[in-house]
Each structure stands twice: as structure tokens, then as C-alpha cells.
């Protein structure tokens, strides 16, 4: 895999109309349909009787179907873990310690396109079957270090998303590296967990939206 950037797209029409608008733009570029994709997230909260509150986010990405991504949030730091599918079973077995917040299960799914070295995904974000927004994912496959290809990716994103895309690199990549505090994530080799972390960041923002603006519906 290469480097991936997520970009929320503002809604001026319904969700379906927005996706259709973006789909036409992507097809006009010459991108070729390449199946469907799905990224989902379910969140578990620890039993308050067992000590300080902790949260576990369990995510799946159709690009890595054999992997389960989990992120433990202690309140002061996040600890990522990548495992196989048995981890889902484990979470059901420790129900007394961690309880799923079913009403906040959230996912982004939609069509996947390929355009040369780029992969484009147009995602409709829903939480408990309620439409929350549109999230565009773009991957540039030949690149391994975000800082080396951001300018190219920015130009590509702005080419079909317009001025909604900032000239500045997304805040996720400007964070200090956990491996080398002297570097930012922009200078590290990109990993699948980086895509998951970006999705969790955006999913968290969507969850904070108690209701969609008037007139914005799927």
C-alpha cells in the first residue's frame, strides 16, 4: 500500500446527490470502477467498577480483510494493536469488562475507483443507519512517506474536490512521531494503522454531530 489521505466533503445537497456529484467528477477524470469498500468502527467502554475508564475502538478495513485493528484509549494516550479475526471473538467473551456502544457503531462505505497510481474511495458515513456525511479517501500507491508526496496528492485532491482541500498537510501527519519525537508522522513510513487512525479521527468528529443540518439527508 501507499500513502492515504482522508478528506471530508461538505454537504450542500443530500448525501446521495453529493456522492453522485463526486462520482461524475471521478469518472470524468478517467478513473475506473474497482469494486466496493467498507471501513467500520465499534467502540467498547470499560466497566467503571474495574478502575479508570478506558475505551477500545475496533475497526475493520476491507483493504485488509484478515486484520482487526484495535485502539485502546486510556484517556492520556492511544495504544494501537493489529490482530487477526479472532480478536472480534475475544471482545464478545470479555463483555462484563467491556460493553459495546451499539448505538455509536459507524461505517464508511461506497464505490472504489482506480486512476493510474491513485485509488479513490467515495464513502457514505452512517451511524446506526443514520447518514452523517461524505468522506473521500485517496491513496497514492507508489509513495511510502507522506511528506514526500503531499504536494502531488494535494494537487490531485484539489483537482476534483476544489478549494475544500487545504494547502496544508492534514493535522494527523504533523503530529510528533511516537518512535522518534524529533520527527513528525509526515516523515515516517506509512502503515495501514495510519489509515485506521485517520478514520477514527473523522468517525469521532461525526459522532459528535448530534444531528445533521436541516435539508441534509441521504
Curated annotation (Swiss-Prot):
One of its GO terms (molecular function) is transcription coactivator activity. Pfam families: Med20 (PF08612). It is found in: Nucleus. GO terms for cellular component: mediator complex. GO terms for biological process: regulation of transcription by RNA polymerase II. InterPro entries: Mediator_Med20. Keywords: Activator, Nucleus, Transcription, Transcription regulation. Its main location: nucleus. The keyword Nucleus applies. The keyword Transcription applies. Component of the Mediator complex, a coactivator involved in the regulated transcription of nearly all RNA polymerase II-dependent genes. Mediator functions as a bridge to convey information from gene-specific regulatory proteins to the basal RNA polymerase II transcription machinery. Mediator is recruited to promoters by direct interactions with regulatory proteins and serves as a scaffold for the assembly of a functional preinitiation complex with RNA polymerase II and the general transcription factors. Component of the Mediator complex. Belongs to the Mediator complex subunit 20 family. This is Mediator of RNA polymerase II transcription subunit 20. It comes from Anopheles gambiae (African malaria mosquito).
Amino acid at each position: 500500500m501507499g500513502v492515504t489521505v482522508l478528506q471530508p466533503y461538505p454537504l450542500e445537497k443530500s448525501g446521495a446527490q453529493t456522492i453522485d456529484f463526486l462520482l461524475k467528477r471521478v469518472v470524468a477524470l478517467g478513473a475506473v470502477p474497482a469494486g466496493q469498500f467498507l471501513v467500520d468502527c465499534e467502540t467498547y467502554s470499560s466497566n467503571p467498577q474495574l478502575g479508570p475508564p478506558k475505551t477500545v475502538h475496533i475497526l475493520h478495513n476491507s483493504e485488509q480483510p484478515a486484520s482487526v485493528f484495535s485502539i485502546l484509549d486510556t484517556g492520556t494516550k492511544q495504544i494501537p494493536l493489529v490482530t487477526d479475526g479472532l480478536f472480534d471473538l475475544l471482545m464478545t467473551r470479555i463483555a462484563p469488562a467491556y460493553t459495546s456502544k451499539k448505538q455509536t457503531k459507524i461505517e464508511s462505505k461506497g464505490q472504489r475507483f482506480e486512476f493510474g497510481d491513485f485509488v479513490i474511495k467515495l464513502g457514505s458515513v452512517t451511524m446506526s443507519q443514520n447518514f452523517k456525511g461524505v468522506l473521500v479517501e485517496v491513496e497514492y500507491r507508489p509513495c511510502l512517506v507522506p511528506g514526500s508526496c503531499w504536494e502531488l496528492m494535494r494537487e490531485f485532491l484539489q483537482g476534483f474536490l476544489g478549494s475544500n482541500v487545504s494547502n496544508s498537510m492534514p493535522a494527523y501527519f504533523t503530529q510528533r512521531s511516537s518512535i522518534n519525537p524529533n520527527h513528525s508522522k509526515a516523515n515516517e513510513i506509512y502503515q495501514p494503522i495510519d489509515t485506521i487512525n485517520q478514520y477514527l479521527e473523522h468517525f469521532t468528529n461525526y459522532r459528535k454531530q448530534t444531528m445533521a443540518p436541516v435539508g441534509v439527508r441521504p
